[in-house]
Every structure is written in C-alpha cells, then in structure tokens.
C-alpha cells in the first residue's frame, strides 16, 4: 500500500485541525448533541466507555486520542473515576474540553507526533479520530500506542470499515478522511503487538465504521 508524501500528509492533518477549529460547536454542542446533519448516534458512547471501564481497575489511566471538546467520551471516562488525558490538536476543541470536563487533563498535540512515557497508561481510546489521520501515520501510530500501554493494557478505537480516502465539505468546513479496511487495521494491530479481541460494525446511515478492542501483548 502506497501513501502520500510527508508534505501532503502534513497538509491533510492541517486541514482537519482548521476544520474542527471552525466547526467545533456545530459538530458537538455543549450538551453533547451531534450535528443534526450527522448520522452519528452519540448515545452509543456510554456503552462503549462502560465496556472499556469494566476492564480497568479504579483510577486507571486512560488516554483519549482526538478528544475534541471532551463530550461525551472524555466526560464519560472521567465520570467513571478514571484518570483521563485528552489529546487534540484543535485549539478551539481543547479550550472547550478544558471548560466542559474539568476532571480530566488535556494537552494540545497532533496524535501522530505525540510523545508519552513507555508503559505509562492502562488504556488508549480513539473515537472517530484516527479516521482523520493519513493512513501512513495511522499505521506508524499503532506501535507507539503499544509502547505507551502497560502490558495487558487496552486499545479501543473506531476505525474504517472499508478503504476510502477523500476531502469534502463537512458542516461548513473542508474535512479530510482516510480509511483502510477492517482487515488491514486488524493486521496492523497484530503487527504492533496489539492483539485484536473483537471488532463490531457500527452502522451509520448508509455506511458505517468498525469498533475494535485490542490488548497489549
């Protein structure tokens, strides 16, 4: 599989950052509601977070990659007594997250360039954020996530269900997406010593994504 050049991938990531700076409130209200034009079912997050939290000890450390404005996922994680670090590269999203989820810590960073201590966290979550990262950077990120996790730690993420790359207007801003197939993601995870435990298709309107849980070996 061939990927775009470094400069092109940087341009694509910048497009996503500017896009979420522009559409932050349209994408997710302070009440946690999704945009009316979106097929996303925000109520699903509660169940996903509950499944992850049920695997962790009280007070476990969780990194929420691409946390956005912190709602609902970061807030749900923190509300279950977990120590949460939210990561997002949109300044607008992050400022809202700091206000809306004071129980969590936040850092403004591009997940593709994030540095964390090895074996410093019990779980990593990435809900609808990896799909905005160029595929070459997604693949390179999985071994780093494994490095951040303690042995036996968990990675829960929404990834693509089928291969697709594109840029299109979204809620009034240009946005970029990059999806591999579910099978490709499972291969990448396995190669990074993140053993897939299960994956589920999440239908959304006429399409959908895949939710996958993996465990650090």
PLM features per residue range, with description:
Residues 139-151:
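A short glycine-rich, Lys/Arg-flanked "PGG" loop and its adjoining helix->strand segment in the class I
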Residues 177-193:
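Short alpha-helix
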Residues 201-217:
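Core SAM-dependent methyltransferase catalytic element
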């Amino acid at each position: 599989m061939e990927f775009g050049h470094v400069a092109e991938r940087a341009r694509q990531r910048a497009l996503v950052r500017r896009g979420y700076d522009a559409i932050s409130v349209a994408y997710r209200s302070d009440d946690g509601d999704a945009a009316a034009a979106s097929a996303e079912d925000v109520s699903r997050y509660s169940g996903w977070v509950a499944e992850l939290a049920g695997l962790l000890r009280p007070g476990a450390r969780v990194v929420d990659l691409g946390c956005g404005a912190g709602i609902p996922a970061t807030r749900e994680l923190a509300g279950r007594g977990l120590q949460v670090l939210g990561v997002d590269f949109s300044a607008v999203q992050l400022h809202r997250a700091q206000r809306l989820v004071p129980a969590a810590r936040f850092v403004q960073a591009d997940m593709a360039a994030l540095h964390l201590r090895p074996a410093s966290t019990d779980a990593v979550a990435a809900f609808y954020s990896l799909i905005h990262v160029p595929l070459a950077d997604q693949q390179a990120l999985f071994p780093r996530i494994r490095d951040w996790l303690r042995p036996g730690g968990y990675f829960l993420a929404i990834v693509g269900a089928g291969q697709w790359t594109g840029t299109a207007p979204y809620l009034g801003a240009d946005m970029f997406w990059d999806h591999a197939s579910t099978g490709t993601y499972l291969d990448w995870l396995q190669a990074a010593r993140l053993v897939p435990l299960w994956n589920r298709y999440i239908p959304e309107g006429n399409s959908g994504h895949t939710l996958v849980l993996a465990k650090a070996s």
